[in-house]
Amino acid sequence: MKDEIIQQTGAYIASSILKQPNRVIKTDQALISSGLIDSFSLVDLALFVEDTFNVHLDDSELNKDIFDNLDQLAELVVSRAA
């Protein structure tokens, strides 16, 4: 499940947020702290994750400590789905 979350979320970031559908987002690549994703894009990403994986994310979780790379994000989703 974790690999599927990483794949789908990475593809969403590349195509819908960055508008670079062929770009590959590495699992440990910093998203927020590197400036790759801004606060507006972060909200879009959170809505995608909630809708796609049927989990609830608290606004307080939308930060670089929890949401800064695909691996962290997938771990959060897996923990919520359990």
Can you say where each PLM-predicted feature lies in the sequence?
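Phosphopantetheine carrier-protein modules
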Residues: 17-36, 53-63
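Conserved catalytic core of two-component sensor histidine kinases
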Residues: 43
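AMP-binding/adenylate-forming catalytic domain of the ANL superfamily
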Residues: 61-72
